[in-house]
């Protein structure tokens, strides 16, 4: 299993990157966000999809984007093509905010997703626990504090998604408000 590839960009074309790793060139399918973020060199976190007669690599410049993609392809009716369209349209944080807010209209803006698919994705993603690596240490401290109060980790992560504060006390208060609304 390939976890990641680091190399020089050999060619970029239409959502695919040819990556030269020690004179072996790999074809990576990438989101438009990853496509536009890389220049001459890159490190890509890899998801391999192996089917009967096909072996495909999906590359992501960001670990959280890979985690989102991996979660999406586990959903009914969401294959790699739709998952990549989601990753091309929204950042992982924005997508999780859409799920937390049940914003069906935002989902319908994604190519390949109609009203039925949007409803199904909202319902099924609500059951998944996707924990992104946060650069903000306040996120982790708030998560621990709320877990010690007995809240479910998945509910806490949903509540913390979208809170943009570097103040621990304020973050916990805002998350508690969201969590208390879910209880009622």
Curated annotation (Swiss-Prot):
Residues 1-61 are annotated as: Domain I. GO terms for biological process: DNA recombination; DNA repair. Belongs to the RuvA family. Homotetramer. Forms an RuvA(8)-RuvB(12)-Holliday junction (HJ) complex. HJ DNA is sandwiched between 2 RuvA tetramers; dsDNA enters through RuvA and exits via RuvB. An RuvB hexamer assembles on each DNA strand where it exits the tetramer. Each RuvB hexamer is contacted by two RuvA subunits (via domain III) on 2 adjacent RuvB subunits; this complex drives branch migration. In the full resolvosome a probable DNA-RuvA(4)-RuvB(12)-RuvC(2) complex forms which resolves the HJ. Transmembrane segments: none annotated. Residues 62-135 are annotated as: Domain II. SMART domains: HhH1 (SM00278). Has three domains with a flexible linker between the domains II and III and assumes an 'L' shape. Domain III is highly mobile and contacts RuvB. The RuvA-RuvB-RuvC complex processes Holliday junction (HJ) DNA during genetic recombination and DNA repair, while the RuvA-RuvB complex plays an important role in the rescue of blocked DNA replication forks via replication fork reversal (RFR). RuvA specifically binds to HJ cruciform DNA, conferring on it an open structure. The RuvB hexamer acts as an ATP-dependent pump, pulling dsDNA into and through the RuvAB complex. HJ branch migration allows RuvC to scan DNA until it finds its consensus sequence, where it cleaves and resolves the cruciform DNA. The keyword Secreted does not apply. Residues 135 are annotated as: Flexible linker. Its main location: cytoplasm. This is Holliday junction branch migration complex subunit RuvA. The keyword Signal does not apply. GO terms for cellular component: cytoplasm; Holliday junction helicase complex; Holliday junction resolvase complex. SUPFAM superfamilies: DNA helicase RuvA subunit, C-terminal domain, Nucleic acid-binding proteins, RuvA domain 2-like. GO terms for molecular function: ATP binding; four-way junction DNA binding; four-way junction helicase activity.
């Amino acid at each position: 299993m390939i976890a990641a590839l680091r190399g020089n960009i050999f060619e970029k074309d239409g959502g695919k990157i040819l990556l030269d790793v020690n004179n072996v060139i790999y074809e990576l399918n990438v989101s438009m966000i990853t496509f536009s973020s890389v220049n001459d060199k890159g490190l890509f976190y890899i998801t391999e999809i192996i089917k009967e007669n096909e072996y495909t690599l999906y590359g992501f410049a960001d670990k959280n984007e890979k985690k989102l993609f991996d979660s999406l392809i586990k959903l009914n009716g969401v294959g790699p093509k739709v998952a990549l369209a989601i990753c091309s349209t929204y950042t992982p944080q924005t997508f999780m905010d859409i799920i937390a807010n049940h914003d069906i209209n935002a989902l319908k803006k994604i190519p390949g997703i109609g009203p039925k698919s949007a409803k199904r994705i909202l319902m099924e993603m609500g059951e998944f626990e996707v924990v992104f690596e946060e650069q903000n240490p306040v996120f982790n401290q708030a998560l621990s504090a709320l877990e010690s109060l007995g809240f479910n980790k998945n509910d806490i992560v949903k509540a913390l998604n979208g809170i943009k504060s570097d103040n621990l006390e304020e973050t916990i208060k805002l998350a508690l408000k969201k969590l208390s609304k879910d209880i009622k």
